[in-house]
Amino acid sequence: MARLALLSVSNKTGLIDLARRLVEEFEFDLISSGGTAQALKDAGLPVTKVADYTGSPEILGGRVKTLHPRIHGGILARRDVASDLTDLENNQIRPIDLVVVNLYPFESTIAKPGVTLAEAVEQIDIGGPAMLRASSKNFAHLTVLCDPAQYDEYLQELRQNNGVASLEFRQKAALKGFLHTASYDSAIASYLSGTQQHTLSGTELQSLRYGENPHQPAAWYQTGTTPTGWTAAEKLQGKELSYNNLVDLEAARRIIAEFTDTPAATIIKHTNPCGTALADTIVEAYQKAFNADATSAFGGIVALNRPIDAATASELTKTFLECVIAPDCDAEAQKILSKKSNVRVLTLADLSTGPKTLVKQIAGGFLVQAADDIAADTSQWQVVTERQPTPDELAELLFAWKVCKHVKSNAIVVTSDRTTLGVGAGQMNRIGSTKIALEQAGDKAKGAILASDGFFPFDDTVRTAAAAGISAIVQPGGSLRDQDSVKAANELGLLMVLTGVRHFLH
């Protein structure tokens, strides 16, 4: 008798090719439900609908399809237990040798803006997890596949082992099944419990050489089953990504995501921008960002919000860089970049979408916060000095504010012509960061903009900025001594804008 495969998937990637190989190369019979059965039928493949096999129609609008003894008996039967085989025979149940199942897209559903509770609940799979757990439990006697990435390996197993997957493969596949259901249930529990329960689940995507330092083991995990963010990026060339590369790439992505309307470039070192700029073309933006701090740019991470063209690629090859990320890279640019084969060049079409929540571990637990995704809204800004901003000054203030948001606190950023001139990051006092940023800017500080991620507890930052030639300041406000800083700004002829929003970054 031909072997029996049950196929019931939401993600139909690779489904038809797998099913065709099962039928034509290994003589499997196929049973399937709902949309999967229709897809197989449309492809011209012989398939029996689950409802026809069980003799029970799908009911409750499709909520009950595979929850039937003829399905679960065929999955859970032990082929080496006589009483199990007798039960199968008495109930006219065929043993199922392969279960291919993946689950309703619950996580992608709840990630959609405005999704309702009812919409989320409808995407809670019942039959899928039941089949997945049952077949994973009985791995000694059948194979379960829950990821299209497993299909080719499974077919190779059949070809190499006379049509039967090895026990080692079946056990590995079963583990993947249990991990899949555990992650799925955790996502549901986290969603329904709100802040009462938070579960972080991931599948190891890649073992990394080490973490921040060589003595720290590290690995890269993917959340969910669908590649998104960095797991969806395409690496065009270069060495394997390191832990520090990935951390810096994410910092670069967050900055570049602030700018969509104008070509933008940023260069990151240790998660802080050493140069960020806007320009009419992407090559000009990169040149401006590089020249903002050419010394620090050496060995940096570059992010661009426009595709890499030949001119930009030529500029990128003039110095040592760890990584370059952009939405795309044309063929001529790839050819030029290939001359620097160690540089990791990645493309990611969507650089704007990041995690909605951030997690940080502490002793005995972890902290969860919403990502700092609030968009800058100049209509809510308050001009608190006598001097009012010109349209160009307002645009420069906005640029400086967006960059400052992504600099480690205490953060001070000096900019001009939509280019960073100086970045003071991570100092224990604000005046210290101010002095660093102004020292980097040098004479270029005259007429420039200064942004601060936090309020000024004293007027010393204003006076130090004015002495260096700064013409305008943007900061959150909120200090008990705000009026001291405003008074100093008016005395010294500076423009000051309060945003009402703080952007601490630790």
UniProtKB/Swiss-Prot annotation:
State whether keyword Cell membrane applies.
Answer: no
Instruction: Show the PROSITE patterns listed in the entry.
Output: MGS (PS51855)
Q: Which reaction is this enzyme known to catalyze?
A: (6R)-10-formyltetrahydrofolate + 5-amino-1-(5-phospho-beta-D-ribosyl)imidazole-4-carboxamide = 5-formamido-1-(5-phospho-D-ribosyl)imidazole-4-carboxamide + (6S)-5,6,7,8-tetrahydrofolate; IMP + H2O = 5-formamido-1-(5-phospho-D-ribosyl)imidazole-4-carboxamide
The record's Gene Ontology biological-process terms are:
'de novo' IMP biosynthetic process
Could you tell me which residue ranges the MGS-like domain spans?
1-146
Give the pathway annotation: Purine metabolism; IMP biosynthesis via de novo pathway; 5-formamido-1-(5-phospho-D-ribosyl)imidazole-4-carboxamide from 5-amino-1-(5-phospho-D-ribosyl)imidazole-4-carboxamide (10-formyl THF route): step 1/1; Purine metabolism; IMP biosynthesis via de novo pathway; IMP from 5-formamido-1-(5-phospho-D-ribosyl)imidazole-4-carboxamide: step 1/1
Q: Tell me which UniProt keywords the record has, alphabetically.
A: Hydrolase, Multifunctional enzyme, Purine biosynthesis, Transferase
The family database entries (CDD domains) matched by this protein are listed as: IMPCH
Which InterPro entries has this protein been placed in? AICAR_Tfase_dup_dom_sf (IPR024051), Cytidine_deaminase-like (IPR016193), MGS-like_dom (IPR011607), MGS-like_dom_sf (IPR036914), PurH-like (IPR002695)
Q: Could you confirm whether the keyword Hydrolase appears in this record?
A: yes
Q: Which GO terms describe its molecular function?
A: IMP cyclohydrolase activity; phosphoribosylaminoimidazolecarboxamide formyltransferase activity
SMART domains listed in its UniProt record: AICARFT_IMPCHas, MGS
From which domain of life does this come? Answer: Bacteria
Q: What is one cellular component GO term in this UniProt entry? A: cytosol
Enzyme Commission number? 2.1.2.3, 3.5.4.10
Q: What is known of its domains?
A: The IMP cyclohydrolase activity resides in the N-terminal region.
Q: According to its UniProt record, which protein family does this protein belong to?
A: Belongs to the PurH family.
Listed name of the protein: Bifunctional purine biosynthesis protein PurH
In its UniProt entry, the species of origin is given as Nostoc sp. (strain PCC 7120 / SAG 25.82 / UTEX 2576)
